[in-house]
Each structure stands twice: as structure tokens, then as C-alpha cells.
Amino acid sequence: MTKKAKNVEKISFEDAMKRLEEIIDLMNQPTTSLEASLALYEEADQLMRICESRIQEVEARIKQLSDQRSES
């Protein structure tokens, strides 16, 4: 795993979303090369996977708390 990949995994959900917005802006610029666009796409894909995973973790925790409340 690369250093950049490790840093991305530690990123907060909010920072990941902000970076995704930045990537979209960069990819929409006509001066962004094809190679740069591909690198940005790969970074965005990794960030989206991390965000989806965090959302699933939060949903599972909410369900767990809700189930505990129902059992009480």
C-alpha cells in the first residue's frame, strides 16, 4: 500500500467529501490532461469507497442502537 493510499484511508468523511468536490472541479477544467483525469478518477474512486464504508458503519451502529432501545 502506498503512502498516499494510507493517508486517504485516515481521512475524515467530511474531508473526503470536500476532496471529492475538488476533484470534480479539477476534472471539469478543460486544461486537465487525460492522464491527470485518470489519476483524479482513481483517487475519487478510492474516496467514494471509503465514504460508502463509513456510511455503512454508521448505519449499522444506528441500527444496533435502535435495536437496543427496542429491547428495553
From Swiss-Prot:
NCBIfam families: PRK00977.1-4, xseB. It comes from the Bacteria. InterPro entries: Exonuc_VII_S, Exonuc_VII_ssu_sf. Keywords: Cytoplasm, Exonuclease, Hydrolase, Nuclease. One of its GO terms (cellular component) is cytosol. It comes from Chlamydia trachomatis serovar D (strain ATCC VR-885 / DSM 19411 / UW-3/Cx). This is Exodeoxyribonuclease 7 small subunit. GO terms for biological process: DNA catabolic process. GO terms for molecular function: exodeoxyribonuclease VII activity. It holds the Pfam family Exonuc_VII_S. Its main location: cytoplasm. Its EC number is 3.1.11.6. The keyword Glycosyltransferase does not apply.
